A protein has these predicted regions:
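Small cysteine-rich, disulfide-bonded extracellular modules of the LU/uPAR three-finger superfamily
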Residues: 1-169, 176-210
């Protein structure tokens, strides 16, 4: 058995899913018990990116050292609860970004919404296929920042934010709490959020030359 196969057998998800890297959405689901062992700060929500990066860095060290001491995401059905998805920048979001550069608009990407429609991503989309619950604001309930040339956004949804159980399959970032401009949208395999669970979105958008 090769190393990657051994890792998946030991931890329950692929080795590549431990990486937080540029231009990826990272979706992870945690139980209250595992979450409470490492997310102990009173201000976790406003440091959610830092918390996730630290946690998966420690998980990577476990990998290197052949240990299983670090808390990991839980699994749902046969789907991995931690998966990397390429960002999808929709056309309306790209146009809005260009207008910010030229001063034609003053919007910012400050909201994220989730939904139940698993339709594949397309640049022509303008929002969620089937929105569920209220959007949450990065600058209030999450974290957003720029590190070098990478814009980072982080948000946590738990059973106090959404009526559970619910199967989530999509997420969008927006410029407003309602309506507004969608910047990116992803679809992902079923994440069944239930009582005592939380889902974390870590979004990395690298600005670079083509």
């Amino acid at each position: 058995m090769d190393f990657e196969s051994e890792f998946q057998a030991r931890y329950g998800f692929p080795l590549e899913h431990t990486k937080l890297s540029a231009n990826l959405w990272n979706v992870s689901k945690w139980s209250n018990d595992s979450w409470s062992t490492f997310a102990k700060s009173d201000n976790v929500k406003n440091n959610i990116l830092d918390v996730m990066e630290k946690q998966f860095s420690e998980l990577s060290l476990d990998i290197l050292n052949g240990k299983t001491t670090t808390e990991k995401p839980i699994q749902v059905s046969n789907n991995f609860t931690y998966q990397n998805k390429f960002n999808i920048h929709v056309n309306t979001g790209l146009s809005e970004s260009a207008k910010r550069d030229t001063g034609e608009t003053s919007t910012t990407i400050d909201w994220i919404g989730v939904g139940t429609d698993g339709t594949a991503e397309s640049v022509s989309q303008t929002g969620l296929g089937s929105a569920y619950g209220n959007r949450k604001q990065f600058s209030v309930d999450g974290q957003r920042k720029v590190v070098n040339q990478t814009a980072k956004y982080g948000m946590l949804f738990d059973d106090s934010d959404l009526t559970v159980p619910i199967t989530l399959r999509e997420a969008c970032t927006f410029t407003a709490s309602t309506s507004g401009i969608c910047h990116h949208r992803i679809s992902y395999s079923d994440f069944v959020l239930d009582t005592g669970e939380r889902i974390v979105f870590s979004i990395y958008e690298l600005m670079q030359n083509g």
